[in-house]
UniProtKB/Swiss-Prot annotation:
One Pfam family here: tRNA-synt_2c
Listed GO MF terms: alanine-tRNA ligase activity; aminoacyl-tRNA deacylase activity; ATP binding; tRNA binding; zinc ion binding
PROSITE patterns recorded: AA_TRNA_LIGASE_II_ALA
Domain text: Consists of three domains; the N-terminal catalytic domain, the editing domain and the C-terminal C-Ala domain. The editing domain removes incorrectly charged amino acids, while the C-Ala domain, along with tRNA(Ala), serves as a bridge to cooperatively bring together the editing and aminoacylation centers thus stimulating deacylation of misacylated tRNAs.
Domain of life per record: Bacteria
Residues that bind Zn(2+): H564, H568, C666, H670
HAMAP family assigned to the protein according to its UniProt record, in alphabetical order: Ala_tRNA_synth_B
Gene this chain is encoded by: alaS
Cofactor(s) required for function per UniProt: Zn(2+)
Provenance organism: Crocosphaera subtropica (strain ATCC 51142 / BH68) (Cyanothece sp. (strain ATCC 51142))
Record protein name field: Alanine--tRNA ligase
Main location: cytoplasm
Entry similarity comment: Belongs to the class-II aminoacyl-tRNA synthetase family.
EC number(s) per entry: 6.1.1.7
Length: 879
């Protein structure tokens, strides 16, 4: 008997996945941040990324089984977003993971049970693939699950064999596909046919280790890594033609369509692509900003900026002028806030960042349009804009090729697409390595270096300055013999006092010096025991085998270790005040601030935050000595030392003990006495994902700086309003009330003016047979007042048509059409269609109901022409 899968919302799909695996003893873990701890990738691009050190055997997990819904960002196929049914930049990956616990048989059994019993997918609609040599998986699917062999497809290594890199953990995988058209039969199943099949669940069986010769040896601990795309499962269960029309994304698309006065269902394919891009990208930017990413010209900040700019560009392509992203972002926030409450809590920050970027890019686009005008002028006689010029506009000014083509077409010019695509391919080749895959191996050069040099000896717990030998010099990740002054370098030493970033603590800063040599070290990272010092050669040159003096910045180190010990005190205070079951989910320990993420199902109250702050400052004032000891891990656990999930611990561990207050396993640097911290101040508490909270704080001298800024703001407010500090809150409430009243009064005045002006225009209406026609330029009247005037005029005129236009103060065109019911029925005229066509004269578009519609344009100089055309056409049509 054929079953029918029930409709489930995106939230229901996510919850049922997590609860299913929780019932099978999997620990539900919150989504990691989109900012990964892994320095080899810019963004979290897969559900397994947070577990990478566990899969590589570098860390021991606290749980043998885990399940997550992980936020992910991928931009390697950004040009396909909106053009295919399933490409996205932002997506959620549902996953279940086994760390040396269950393996292939159980993973397959649960995947089938989840798919057919929980989601109730018809078994006859599921096709699976296995690695061509994985007879065990084939047999399990056929004999244990009962899938007919013709619906089990053997695939090659390219499709169904996962590997970490040239060497390391690897294994076959098995994928579950949904068949939208099982009636086509099982004779010629082609899983590449994405109009019929969609892959929705991937099971990776990590069971081998590949050596340098390519030989495979069984792993001692076999792991399971799976991924189910939430958006793909939503498409299947909600029975929509693509991921974009699911309840996870489509409300965002609808918001953008409404702003542009577009009916999505009736829109052209080109317009739908732009709306889908907006829907996808807005999800990305909202979550990126919520996770602390800000727009910039480098690294993940550039990814954010690029996505925001693409939203603006596609908005212009569908006729949206001016700022609009904040409105669309509000819908994205509404859709995500239940699963990821931090998007609502950081709403003002998200919208502020979007507004700043949108404003700046609109100015950039104006400059791009000017440059395009110059290019058109110089190429008019040639009949074609070069691909190089088009790519410069695209790459430097963010000017989309489609927009360049449209504007060029108006001047009877084409664009050299082949040349443009050649430039694009060159750029993609330069950048694809940073985005394509997760690299679970040591970065290229370091991988080779590790074969020739020993791990760096870290002596920085006791030595803040020492002499060391230069083992390697790298520029842009490539080894060189010598680096000259001005070079940005990465230096590997045989021993170092510099702490390498780990455990949330940033790397030390300082200098490497020698005879006529100065290298300013700005950061230190470590990979597989090798410490890499990132810096700039400020004087002289540095070569392999040179002797240098390595000196850390003591002031920075003091502040970092004060913040690190303060972080331990913060966790202890949270356990004491809020809930003893609270555990660390992440942290940042910098020289100027600290951040602590922790598992907690609710917000910490303001009263609790004050109690936590007071308790920490009490511990600081009590001047507790910090005791640091190395001991067997079992001894540390017996003493009650706190360990963090996901961290790798050896048989011997380093324990940081503030007697009677806190005891944690930690490899970071710390104060000798809590009194060295000085002061502690909580700046904020917020949610960053479902069940995970974040506290940001400052300690030591940074507290005084923080309070100084606050004091300056308070003093400025008191001086400006001639009030006392304790009166500020009441004054703000009063001002808000007055502003709200004033805004209402202003709106009423605008409406009164619109009514008055519309009454004056009644005498200008012309009679055309049994109908009245009024077409008028309303000056700078805003869009809302324009609509009020049009509706009132049409009601007073009776049977007929009213067309009004204006150029509001922000400099864009607004148009309104109001038609009587008789005009709709007898003359077959629709206000929406009519005003949409007229708006094209002003370089815009719009639409609406048959009796009332609005439109806009971006060429105010053509308003008179548009109104004249409207009058001529209606005069003819109403006869």
């Amino acid at each position: 008997m054929t079953t029918t899968a029930p409709f489930l919302t995106g939230n229901q799909i996510r919850d049922r996945f997590l609860q299913f695996y929780a019932q099978h003893n999997h620990q539900i873990l919150p989504s990691a941040s989109l900012v990964p701890e892994d320095p080899t990738v810019l963004l979290t691009i897969a559900g397994m990324l947070p577990f990478k050190p566990i899969f590589l055997g570098q860390k021991q997990p606290d749980f043998p089984r885990a399940t997550t819904s992980q936020k992910c960002i991928r931009t390697n196929d950004i040009e396909n977003v909106g053009r295919t049914a399933r490409h996205h930049t932002f997506f959620e990956m549902l996953g279940n993971f086994s760390f040396g616990d269950y393996f292939k048989e159980q993973a397959i059994k649960w995947a089938w049970e989840l798919s057919t019993k929980v989601y109730r997918l018809p078994p006859e609609n599921i096709v699976v693939s296995v690695f061509e040599k994985d007879d065990e998986a084939f047999k399990l699917w056929e004999e244990m699950i009962g899938i007919p062999p013709q619906r089990i497809k053997r695939m090659g290594e390219k499709d169904n064999f996962w590997k970490a890199g040239p060497t390391g953990p690897c294994g076959p995988c098995s994928e579950l596909y949904y068949d939208f058209h099982p009636e086509l039969g099982e004779d010629n199943i082609d899983l590449e046919d994405d109009s019929r099949f969609i892959e929705f669940y991937n099971l990776v069986f990590m069971e081998y280790n590949r050596d340098a010769e390519g030989n495979l040896a069984p792993l001692q601990n076999k792991n399971i890594d799976t991924g189910m795309g939430l958006e793909r499962m939503a498409q299947i269960l909600q029975k929509v033609p693509n991921n974009y029309e699911t309840d996870l994304i489509f409300p965002i698309i609808e918001t953008a369509a409404n702003i542009a006065n577009i009916d999505y269902q009736k829109a052209t394919e080109k317009t739908k692509v732009s709306l889908k891009v907006i829907g996808d990208h807005v999800r990305s930017v909202v979550h990126m900003i919520a996770d602390g990413i800000t727009a910039s010209n480098t690294d993940r900040g550039y990814v954010l900026r690029r996505l925001i700019r693409r939203v603006v560009r596609h908005g212009r392509l569908i006729g949206i002028e001016g700022q609009f992203i904040k409105q669309v972002a509000e819908t994205a926030i509404e859709l995500s806030e239940n699963a990821y409450p931090q998007v609502r809590e950081r709403e003002s920050f998200i919208k502020g960042e979007l507004e700043r970027e949108e404003t700046a890019f609109l100015k950039t686009l104006e400059r791009g349009e000017k440059l395009l005008a110059e290019i058109i002028e110089k190429t008019e006689t040639q009949g074609q804009i070069s691909g190089v010029d088009a790519f410069t506009l695209y790459d430097t000014y963010g000017f989309p090729l489609e927009l360049t083509q449209e504007i060029a077409e108006e001047s009877n010019l084409t664009v050299n697409i082949e040349e443009f695509e050649a430039e694009m391919r060159q750029q993609q080749e330069r950048s694809k390595a940073a985005h394509e895959t997760i690299d679970l191996t040591v970065q290229g050069s370091l991988d080779k270096l590790a074969e020739h040099i020993h791990p760096t000896a870290f002596l920085g717990y006791t030595d803040l300055q020492l002499t060391a030998k230069v083992e390697a010099v790298l520029i842009q990740g490539k080894t060189v013999d010598t680096a000259e002054a001005g070079s940005e370098v990465q230096i590997v030493l045989d021993q170092t006092p510099f702490y390498g970033e780990s455990g949330g603590q940033i790397g030390d800063r300082g200098f490497l010096t020698g005879e006529n040599l100065v290298i300013r070290v700005e950061d230190v990272q470590k990979e597989s025991g090798i410490f890499v010092h990132f810096g700039r050669v400020e004087r002289g040159s540095v070569s392999v085998n040179d002797q240098v003096t390595a000196t850390i910045d003591r002031a920075c180190r003091r502040q970092v270790q004060a913040n690190h010990t303060a972080t331990h005190l913060l966790q202890a205070a949270l356990k004491k005040v809020v809930d003893k079951s609270i555990s660390q989910a992440g942290s940042l320990v910098a020289f100027d601030r600290l951040r602590f993420d922790f598992n907690c199902p609710r917000a910490v109250t303001s009263e609790e935050l004050q109690e936590i702050e007071d308790l920490i400052n009490t511990w600081i004032a009590e001047a507790h000595e910090t005791e640091i000891a190395v001991m067997p891990i079992e001894t540390a656990k017996e003493k009650g030392a706190i360990a963090m999930f996901g961290e790798k611990y050896g048989s011997e561990v380093r324990v940081i003990d503030v007697p009677g207050v806190s005891m944690e396993l930690c490899g970071g640097t710390h104060v000798k006495n809590t009194a060295e911290i000085g002061l502690f101040k909580i700046m904020s508490e917020s949610g960053i994902s479902s069940g995970v909270r974040r506290i940001e704080a400052v300690a030591g001298p940074a507290v005084l700086e923080y309070l100084k800024v606050r004091e300056t703001v308070v003093k400025d407010l008191c001086d400006r309003f001639k009030i006392k500090p304790e009166e500020i809150s009441d004054r703000i409430t009063t001002l808000q009330s007055e502003l709200k009243t004033t805004q209402k009064e202003l709106e009423a005045v605008k409406q009164d003016l619109a009514v008055a002006k519309s009454d004056q225009l009644l005498t200008e209406a012309e009679s055309i047979g049994e109908f009245k026609l009024l077409v008028s330029d309303m000056g700078e009247m805003d869009a809302k007042a324009l609509q009020t005037a049009a509706e009132r005029l049409q009601q007073k005129l009776g049977e007929g048509a009213v067309i009004l236009g204006s150029i509001p103060s922000e400099g864009k065109v607004s148009l309104v059409a109001a038609f009587s019911k008789k005009v709709n029925q007898e003359k077959q005229l629709q206000a929406g269609k009519f005003i949409g066509q007229i708006a094209k004269i002003c370089g815009g578009g719009g639409g609406g109901r048959p009796n009332l519609a609005q439109a806009g344009g971006r060429e105010p100089s053509k308003l008179s022409e548009a109104l004249l055309t409207a009058k001529e056409q209606l005069t003819e049509s109403l006869k």
